[in-house]
Curated annotation (Swiss-Prot):
Substrate binds at Y111. Formation of pseudouridine at positions 38, 39 and 40 in the anticodon stem and loop of transfer RNAs. It comes from Ehrlichia ruminantium (strain Welgevonden). One of its GO terms (biological process) is tRNA pseudouridine synthesis. The keyword Membrane does not apply. It catalyses: uridine(38/39/40) in tRNA = pseudouridine(38/39/40) in tRNA. GO terms for molecular function: RNA binding; tRNA pseudouridine(38-40) synthase activity. Belongs to the tRNA pseudouridine synthase TruA family. This is tRNA pseudouridine synthase A.
Amino acid sequence: MRYKIVIEYDGSDFIGWQKQNHNSNSIQEILEKAIFKFSKQHVIVYGAGRTDAGVHALGQVAHFDLTTDFETYIVRNAINYHLISHAIAVVHVEKTDTDFHARFSAKRRYYLYKIVNRYSPLTIDRNRAWLVHTPLNVENMIKAVCYIKGNHNFSSFRAKCCQSKSPIKTVDNLSITYNHPYIDINISAISFLHHQVRIIVGTLVECGKGYFPPEHIKTIMEANNRSYAGTTAPSYGLYFVKVDYS
């Protein structure tokens, strides 16, 4: 039986989603251990997005297979019981067809990046938003968005260690909302390059600081060179919001 789960987590204390040989503090491995504790079955949990260390999730989707047909509420409650000491929660469980794959069946992924633009330090939003002291010209940031949306070669916006075969991606939506001092950047695509969202955010912030005009984003894009784009925004401001499968 294949189970599809929706997961929420605070990424602050984890090395990221994916298991690593030298470290057991990944969200994937912690979930697999929790599932084993109640089912006594070794499973592999496949996630829709392999979030980096510090990145949070409001609606990460994953799947795994069990030989036992449990009621979905039992699966949810049992996993959460064994996650009680971790900042991870399963918020929804459903049974699904065996041809469903959390990663490869995804049609669109949605991310949110949170910025707080003020001089005072953060308290409630500490490790949950990027504190930018310099006053930002949000209007210019919004103007720059049009040069990023659409189908492009995003070589300037990918990490050097990115293993994706192609730098061509389509950003379906990119929008900025501003309610001083809070700036929310929402972005969606079928898939993203490694660090693509965080580099886009870092570049938009540099535009907002006045380092270059909005139209310079086009030059950055056409350069196909990582050194032309802005800094990589911190991981702790990024949230994996949800995944569409239809």
